[in-house]
């Protein structure tokens, strides 16, 4: 089944060209099926690029998915036009009465700030609490994952001496996990962050389980056993050129930055990088969507009633 998004969303044509099945509102009405309701709380500056990355993974599922784009109400985006936001986004205040089968919270380029200094931290806390009653399963990514695991479990973040930046080998620590179905024993994942969470802090909670880890970059994916929450601290959703874009952005701005590790062929920035993580990104999101489908109530309004 395809993903349902507005046919004027910039990601629509790109997804069609990539072979992802998408549908319009008219097409969706003709299908006698309840689509999975997935919300995307997009905290990234380049919202259009992030929309495409997430829609690409969610839309690859054989299930019909309706993707709702959501933004923080009290924060003005600097890198996305107001016209785009008004056309395609709702604020959390506008959707907080709804129920969602799945909810994605993205990263944000604010990881060096203490959580309490983030201008929208209060609203972020309200959203995280709201997911407990209005969302069946949540996928938290990068800063979104750090914020969520801090909010729910008090797991702190630690500033790194230098940016963790590149493509790193990771280990599958729980091959029997429903979220790692089909995963290799080891695989590569893009990393781009200035902070980290640590295994010792996570292991203090009996309800958290580490599923992916790197000997160089530490914890990558954590599963909350009872809360149906995933914490992904790296960027499986990244495009082939995402790290390259970040690298050249900083180089052009005169910001000190090391070349991303294990990324450019022969460490030559003039050569196009190869995507070596795409298949596992699709596996992770496909497994997540499938688990939602298997466990969410048929009546979306019953979500949260089992708590």
Curated annotation (Swiss-Prot):
Positions bound to substrate: 163, 192, 249
Q: Annotated pathway, please?
A: Amino-acid biosynthesis; L-methionine biosynthesis via de novo pathway; O-acetyl-L-homoserine from L-homoserine: step 1/1
Which Pfam families does the record match to this protein? HTS (PF04204)
Q: In the UniProt record, which is one GO cellular component term? A: cytoplasm
Query: What residues correspond to the site Important for substrate specificity?
Result: 192
User: Can you say where in the cell this protein is located?
Assistant: Cytoplasm
CDD domains assigned = GATase1_HTS (cd03131)
**Could you tell me the keywords of this UniProt record?**
Acyltransferase, Amino-acid biosynthesis, Cytoplasm, Methionine biosynthesis, Transferase
Q: Where is this site: Important for acyl-CoA specificity?
A: 111
Q: What is its EC number?
A: 2.3.1.31
What HAMAP family does UniProt report for this protein, alphabetically? MetA_acyltransf
Q: What is the protein's known function?
A: Transfers an acetyl group from acetyl-CoA to L-homoserine, forming acetyl-L-homoserine.
Q: Which NCBIfam families match?
A: metA
Q: What is this protein called?
A: Homoserine O-acetyltransferase
């Amino acid at each position: 089944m395809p993903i349902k998004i507005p046919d004027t969303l910039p990601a629509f044509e790109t997804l069609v060209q990539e072979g992802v099945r998408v549908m319009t509102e008219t097409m969706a009405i003709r299908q006698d099926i309840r689509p999975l309701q997935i919300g995307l709380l997009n905290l990234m500056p380049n919202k259009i690029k992030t929309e495409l990355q997430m829609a690409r993974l969610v839309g690859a599922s054989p299930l019909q998915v309706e993707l709702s784009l959501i933004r923080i109400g009290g924060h003005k985006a600097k890198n996305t036009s107001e016209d785009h936001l008004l056309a395609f986004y709702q604020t959390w205040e506008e959707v907080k009465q709804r129920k969602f089968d799945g909810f994605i919270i993205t990263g944000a380029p604010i990881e060096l700030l203490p959580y309490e200094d983030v201008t929208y931290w209060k609203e972020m806390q309200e959203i995280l609490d709201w997911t407990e009653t209005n969302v069946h399963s949540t996928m938290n990514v990068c800063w979104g994952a750090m914020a969520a695991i801090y909010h729910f479990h008090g797991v702190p973040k630690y500033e790194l001496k230098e940016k963790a930046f590149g493509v790193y080998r990771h280990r599958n620590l729980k091959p029997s996990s429903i979220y790692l179905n089909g995963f290799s024993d080891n695989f590569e994942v893009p990393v781009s962050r200035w902070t980290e969470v640590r295994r010792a802090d996570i292991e203090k909670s009996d309800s958290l389980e580490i599923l992916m880890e790197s000997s160089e970059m530490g914890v990558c994916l954590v599963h909350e056993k009872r809360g149906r929450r995933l914490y992904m601290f790296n960027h499986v959703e990244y495009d082939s050129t995402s790290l390259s874009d970040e690298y050249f952005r900083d180089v052009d701005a005169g910001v000190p930055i090391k070349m991303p590790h294990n990324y450019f062929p022969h460490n030559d920035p003039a050569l196009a990088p190869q995507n070596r993580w795409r298949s596992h990104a699709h596996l992770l999101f496909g497994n997540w969507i499938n688990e939602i489908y298997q466990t969410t109530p048929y009546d979306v309004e019953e979500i949260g009633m089992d708590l």
